[in-house]
Amino acid sequence: MRIPTLLFALCLVVSFGNAQGVAPTASQSNAVPAQRTCASHDKYVEMMGGAKFSEMRSRIEQQTQRWESQPVEQRSNQANTVVTIPVVFHVVYANGTQNISDAQIMSQLQILNDDFRRLNSDADNTWSQAADSEVEFCLATNDPQGNPTDGILRISTSVSSFGTSDNVKFSSSGGSDAWPAGSYLNFWVCNVGGGILGYAQFPGGSAATDGVVCDYRYVGDMGTATAPFDLGRTATHEVGHWLNLYHIWGDGNCNQDDQVSDTPNSDAANFGCATGHQSCSSTDMVQNYMDYSDDACMNLFTSGQKTRMQALFAPGGFRASLATSDGCAPACTIGCGCTDATACNYDSAATEDDGSCDFSCQGCTDAEACNYDADATEDDGS
């Protein structure tokens, strides 16, 4: 059901009740609780207190509604068929256990691709609204400077737990600085603390903090992955928020929902796997990635959620630049350099252009001057 609401995603687990509760602090127990809930309202109020974020959220929502109102054929003509998003993992660890393996990271990447493309093995026997979101993820092969990378940064830290203050996103506070948000999905892995699974920043916030944070115990489906959140669906849920999806119950009662027309209204989050649970005169979609069911219970995004996510990549969308990012382009490894003979830094020995060509050489461009520089393209007044 579609009833406007604006909520930021800050997802955590606690060990009580099928209702919203008080979030534990980072200093509290790190034990894995049996259920999850969300302290999103406090974070939402905090961010919406800033005029810039509030205004940007309004603009994004207006653009989303314009996109949703277009005929399907018109949307199809404007959108990329499948959007591939480069991902950089920032693994910030205080000990060897937190420094999760490449294999565990790759398992998470595969789960994201399976879930967003509806290739997950548990996709059968679910709601008819289920859809392929046509969003894929690739491990970054080029860093912001165009250098080859494996897309995984490993940063040793003295910080025992980061909480939700975004300190993990800054090297100055023991974390790792974000790569440009217009070209990459930043995915931080760390010990969040306080029983928190992870959190995401909705579109419209600062580029310096844009991305997803997941506790090292809830990434992928191997290694440190811990039941009942050991199938990588925490990341699927959080990336959903990063792509502008709200919780399916709208963080409220039957009078609030998620701005998606084909998700049934619900009066609260669902935990465990409450298949068949009813509220608001309909059956709750507990299998939706944006509810709070256990990982094994989740298996779909809807067609309406797909449209909402795809609006971000449409002309004028907040994340449109990601659709053309070269963060996953084949890296130049042999014979790299500038191959354009008109560039200042032309390399006659280069066999593969690495994107470094510079056409702004300064010098004297007057051929009659004593210090004429034939390579100069911009006169420096000398």
Identify the function of each model-found stretch.
Residues 146-148:
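Short active-site-adjacent helix-start/loop capping segments
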Residues 44, 260, 279, 344, ...:
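Secreted/processed peptides and extracellular or luminal domains of membrane proteins
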Residues 310, 323, 327-382:
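Primarily marks secretory-pathway-exposed extracellular/lumenal segments that are disulfide-
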Residues 18-116:
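Primarily auto-inhibitory N-terminal propeptides
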Residues 25-59, 181, 253, 273, ...:
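Functionally engaged cysteine thiol sites
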Residues 27-28, 79-81, 87-97, 102-143, ...:
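Extracellular (secreted or membrane-anchored) zinc-dependent metallopeptidases
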Residues 7-15:
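Bacterial N-terminal signal peptides
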Residues 1-5:
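Positively charged n-region of N-terminal signal peptides that target proteins for export
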